[in-house]
Amino acid sequence: VQMPEESAIRLLKDRYGMTGALKRFDTEKDDTFRVTTEDGRRFILKVANPDEPFTEIDFQNSLLRYVETRDPTLPVPRINDTEDGVDIFQIKDVDGSQRCVRLLTFLEGTPLDETQSDKTGRVQIGKMLARLRYATEGFTHEAEDRYYGWDVQHLLTLEHLLDEVDDYTQRQALSQGLERFRHIEVKLRQCRKHVLHND
């Protein structure tokens, strides 16, 4: 059940003591709103899907806090606690489902899919990913072994979705990529790993 905007506004006021204009983002499964306060500050209010366990949300918050201590200048969202000092709280939705709620800072910028890819941009992305990799080194959490289809180590589990790609050229390119991956998968399993979201 999609959370009504009025409910999100009430959560902001009751738990964070703030008011502002909301813009809903289209997401895969959560209710996500950009909040713009009267003084121009921006935040992201995330209301997790009822199927998302608390441990997963805690994993994400713990990782963000860990990164902040390892590389404070790395541009990742910062967590905002409620007025009573809680970083995640649960609500009961209109259908009785439990949902986790949290407030993060909003990162200004242009989404990658709206930019032109050039060598300079790719180098900058590579540098940022390297910083993120080092900032996450050593992080552990009880939920770190969760399964995500887009995690590279599970790439072949998506092979059955190739038939869903209508464009023949794109489907062939994806198929060839999966075939190349099949040959390196064994070597990949032998590599050292640490927590990485891959999103």
Model-derived features: where do they sit?
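Accessory alpha/beta interaction modules
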Residues: 1-14, 34-35, 41
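An alpha-helical support segment within catalytic cores of ATP-dependent transferases
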Residues: 4-12, 141, 156-198
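Short secondary-structure junctions
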Residues: 12-19, 71-75, 188
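Protein kinase glycine-rich loop
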Residues: 23-26
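Active-site acidic catalytic loop and adjacent metal/ATP-binding pocket
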Residues: 28-40, 44-45, 79, 182-199
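ATP-binding pocket architecture of kinase catalytic cores
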Residues: 38-140
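A cross-family kinase active-site recognition segment
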Residues: 83, 114-172, 192-193
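Generic alpha-helical secondary structure signal
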Residues: 99-102, 153, 176
